[in-house]
Regions:
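DNA target-recognition domains and sequence-specific DNA-contacting regions of bacterial/archaeal
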Residues: 11-133, 184
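Non-catalytic DNA-recognition/assembly elements of restriction-modification systems
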Residues: 1-41, 131-180
């Protein structure tokens, strides 16, 4: 899908043509660890927070740090995004799907501007040129990837649930609270 537009430089436009950007913010230390929402750095969940920034999974780019500056990913649902990342906000799901896959397939680390520590700025993202296919093709692409995206999220949620179950069962087995010696396998 992306290949035929790569060489057509008339199709290249600034990323700001189909997206807006929002910096995550530094969580207040006295609030970190309180609340029911995930505090997400772009690298991982770093605790809980009482405020939510995004209710649905949000497309982001990690904007600071040696280990992953330029990585493109989705946040968990119901999260507060910290200042290490920038949200890539689109009005249409098809743009979200296209940008996620396009940016993951290309070297976004070339946008790094920091000298001591790599960083990506909103200004750099706004000017970054990408090929933008016709809307009909983006719709077709989005329709194709949606079932895979949903299955990935379902599998991720199930893995989290199974991990919690494992941790609970192992704890009960180790404490003697649960006895499985009579089970015949």
């Amino acid at each position: 899908m992306f290949g035929k537009y790569e060489q057509n430089f008339n199709a290249h436009k600034p990323l700001s043509t189909i997206a807006k950007f929002k910096y995550g913010t530094m969580p207040k230390k006295d609030k970190l660890g309180t609340g029911h929402y995930h505090a997400f750095s772009g690298y991982q969940i770093v605790g809980t927070y009482p405020e939510v920034m995004f209710e649905n999974p949000q497309l982001i780019i990690v904007a600071r740090g040696v280990g992953g500056c330029g990585d493109v990913k989705y946040t968990p649902a119901n999260c507060y995004l910290t200042n290490l990342s920038i949200a890539i906000i689109t009005e249409k799901t098809m743009h979200d799907d296209y940008l996620y896959h396009y940016l993951r397939l290309h070297d976004t680390k070339i946008m790094n501007t920091g000298s001591a520590q790599p960083q990506i700025t909103v200004a750099t993202l706004e000017k970054f040129e990408i090929p933008i296919p016709p809307e009909e093709e983006m719709i077709r692409f989005s329709d194709f990837v949606q079932p895979f995206k949903q299955q990935y999220r379902n599998n991720h949620d199930e893995n989290k649930l199974l991990s919690k179950l494992r941790d609970t069962l192992v704890s009960k087995l180790m404490s003697g609270e649960l006895d499985v010696s009579d089970i015949d396998i």
